[in-house]
Swiss-Prot record:
Stretches of the chain forming a coiled coil according to its record: none
Organism name: Arabidopsis thaliana
Protein name: Sulfite exporter TauE/SafE family protein 1
A single GO cellular-component term on record: membrane
Chain ranges passing through the membrane: 5-25, 48-68, 70-90, 97-117, 130-150, 153-173, 223-243, 261-281, 316-336, 340-360, 378-398, 408-428
PANTHER family assigned to the protein according to its UniProt record, in alphabetical order: CEREBLON, SULFITE EXPORTER TAUE_SAFE FAMILY PROTEIN 1-RELATED
Pfam family, any one: TauE
Location(s) in or outside the cell: Membrane
Statement: the UniProt record of this protein carries the keyword Nucleotide-binding: no
UniProt keywords, alphabetically: Membrane, Transmembrane, Transmembrane helix, Transport
Family from the record: Belongs to the 4-toluene sulfonate uptake permease (TSUP) (TC 2.A.102) family.
Bilayer topology term: Multi-pass membrane protein
Length: 450
């Protein structure tokens, strides 16, 4: 019973923080100090947006979007971006910064709830698969950087076309995978033992289960602090490169000419870093054995992919997902989750691991936006807290539903719903923008990256 009250207490504390004027004042003071140190105080001239009907509607819709996204372990950036541009009426640049903060809020709540839970198939491991994260994260971050450059070069109509085609295909594959898991759970429920009164003991694979009590009874699980440390080092290295390099407007810790020789040199440093960490992880015996066990566990789902083949495929898949995520401006979580499901990773492990990786990428973007002087940072923080609370609520609801009905497949369906809504909303909004560019006679061809 105590475990169930933890998310509720976190929610109450968060709500108190949102509506506490002194807390907001402290946040403004911190932002002011940081911006003065970085000489970007002029960019924070307007820290909050005036409360209006569209803003309130956007907050309510963001709450529901975060609740659904948290179940699938994806950040929900596609939904947040659409809500902030269509409903709140923000410009795309401002909406992107808001989306980064909101995705960080969702992912932080998700990771906090899943960090010390047990893997349902490996009782001595955490629900978050750190081996998967180590294999995927370097290539995912590199792919995002490449995708951002491609986004500057490609015309809007091409980006929109690629976005619609790829997400429609991914949504279809995800929904099919969800149906497959649903049928598998139904078959397991039919052959359950008669002693299972509630009829869910065989099929249950909860995203949020009563594992913390189980941990107390059986002893602590082996938390991979070393692997977490490696991931933090990777995050810090990529973050430092992006922070020193700055953006295309020349905003950075040091003064660098946008798209100059030093700019591209710092950008290219991400390539050897990615190759180094990927090769080290690939030839790691510890990670290799864990991926082999993954393949053995998922053989009953007919993945047909060996452990070493999985390790070879995952970096390539992560690089592709990162490129597309950076190209579309939605991050890699919505793209990497369907790929992990397709190779047979369990839904609850996929959700927990994806939310962990999304936290790394979204927090990197959010901190860069903040340090480089974003507009309306106060309002963005409030929206992030709203999404944090919504994520906790969504996780509690999913926990109860899975525990009652034994349907972990609802995680897959949640991913499909978010992807379908994002595809429809962003494609529609993008189509109007492309049409406006066409009728106004704007240039619609390829551009230079600078």
């Amino acid at each position: 019973m105590t475990i169930n009250l933890v998310p509720l207490l976190l929610s109450l504390i968060t709500i108190f923080t949102i509506f506490n004027p002194s807390a907001l004042a402290d946040q403004s003071q911190i932002r002011s100090t940081t911006s003065q140190w970085l000489h970007f105080s002029e960019d924070l001239s307007q820290s909050t947006i005036e409360v209006s009907i569209p803003t309130i509607i956007a907050a309510v819709l963001s709450f529901f979007a975060a609740s659904i996204s948290s179940a699938g372990g994806i950040g929900g950036g596609g939904l947040f971006l659409s809500i902030m541009t269509i409903i709140a009426g923000l410009e795309m640049k401002t909406a992107s910064s808001f989306s980064a903060f909101m995705v960080t809020g969702v992912s932080f709540a998700n990771v906090g709830c899943n960090l010390f839970l047990r893997n349902p198939k490996s009782r001595d491991k955490t629900l978050i698969d750190f081996d998967l994260a180590l294999t995927i994260q370097p290539c995912l971050l590199l792919g995002v950087s490449i995708g951002v450059i491609c986004n500057r070069m490609f015309p809007n109509w091409l980006v929109l076309f690629l976005f619609a085609v790829f997400l429609a295909w991914s949504t279809m594959k995800t929904c099919k995978k969800g149906v497959s898991y649903w049928n598998l759970e139904s078959e397991r429920a039919k052959i359950k033992s008669p002693r299972d009164v509630d009829g869910i003991e065989v099929a249950r694979s909860p995203l949020l289960s009563e594992e913390r009590e189980d941990v107390r009874q059986r002893g602590m699980i082996r938390f991979p602090w070393m692997k977490l440390g490696v991931l933090v080092i990777i995050w810090l290295l990529f973050f430092s490169i992006n922070l020193f390099r700055g953006n295309k407007y020349g905003q950075g810790i040091i003064s660098i000419k946008p798209c100059g020789a030093l700019y591209w040199f710092l950008s290219s440093l991400q390539i050897p870093l990615t190759i180094f960490f990927t090769l080290c992880i690939y030839f790691s015996d510890n990670v290799q054995s864990n991926h082999t066990s993954h393949s053995n566990q998922n053989s009953e789902q007919e993945t047909g992919v060996g452990g070493r083949q999985n390790k070879l495929m995952l970096p390539v898949m992560a690089l592709l997902a990162g490129v597309l995520g950076g190209l579309f401006g939605i991050g890699g979580g919505m793209l990497i989750s369907p790929l992990l499901l397709q190779i047979g990773i369990a839904p609850e492990v996929t959700a927990a691991t994806c939310s962990f990786m999304v936290l790394f990428s979204s927090s990197m973007s959010a901190i860069q936006y903040l340090l480089l002087g974003m507009e309306h940072a106060g309002t963005a923080a409030i929206f992030a807290l709203v999404c944090f609370v919504a994520s906790l609520v969504g996780l509690m609801v999913v926990k109860k539903v899975i525990a009652k009905y034994g349907r972990a497949s609802i995680i897959v369906f949640a991913v499909g719903i978010v992807m379908a809504l994002s595809t429809v909303l962003m494609t529609t909004h993008g189509a109007f923008n492309v049409w406006n560019d066409f009728v106004s006679g704007r240039y619609m061809g390829f551009k230079l990256p600078c």
